[in-house]
Amino acid sequence: MRIVLFCHSLLSDWNHGNAHFLRGVVTELTERGHEVRVFEPRDAWSLQNLVADHGEAPLREVRDVYPHVDPIRYDLASLDLDEALEGAALVIVHEWSEPELVARVGAHRAGASYRLLFHDTHHRSVTDPGAMARYDLTHYDGVLAFGRVIRDLYLERRWARRAFVWHEAADARVFRPRREIQPERDLVWVGNWGDEERTRELDEFLIGPARDLGLSARVHGVRYPEHARAALEAAGVEYRGWLPNHRAPDAFARARVTVHVPRRPYVASLPGIPTIRPFEAMACALPLVC
């Protein structure tokens, strides 16, 4: 069947973890014989930051690794939904989409026969419910929530009539053990700074132990402020900046262990909803400290 997905970006995973899971989903559906069309905004901030820092080469690399990921980039003002959704049997709109797009697709669904689902993989329903209430899901057939807590909130607050749990998982085509690579260091951690949502946790569970145990350690990620980079350097931890997600299996293979350092909102308000990183590490057979 023809499936249409609207998301922030599949081309860029710069500070954008949703791309990890969705790339795998698109690949899986395509290889099962479905036709998948992906739409992402031309001005997606993740992609803009990626290109500004690293140029176009990473985008070509993503297409090589994920040949089925070939999104159509659109401008919201000129997006023709009749054309975009022609022949669709299923339409999925990801939560990192503009409320205007969510509402327009919902209005289009009112006069169409496809199934329409809203996909939520973020903590805003707990930490910023006012923002989530802006999404008009009146004509949506249901919500795909990445954990039971989120699913229950949609139902309790009557944001949606139906909601289902759909946990994220690693793409085992890309995330697999690389037995031919020998470890070069003790610890690797792949993750972004986190908008001050896990500053204390990073010091307690990553930076401090690496310093106190004298571990050879490397960190990949973006948006690390100067004080964070200074703390890493003082602890003897090598900071290497952004790492394309499809290269993470290689980084995992070159280390003996990694750690899971969740953001505070997930620990405090979203029990049972780990981010995708632990699954990616375990899929690569890397020991994981939680």
Enumerate the predicted regions with their spans:
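Extended catalytic core of nucleotide-activated donor transferases of GT-like folds
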Residues: 9, 15, 23-27, 37-154
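A short, glycine- and acidic-residue-rich donor-binding loop in the catalytic cores
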Residues: 268-280
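Acidic donor-binding loop of glycosyltransferase active sites
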Residues: 89, 253-270, 286-287
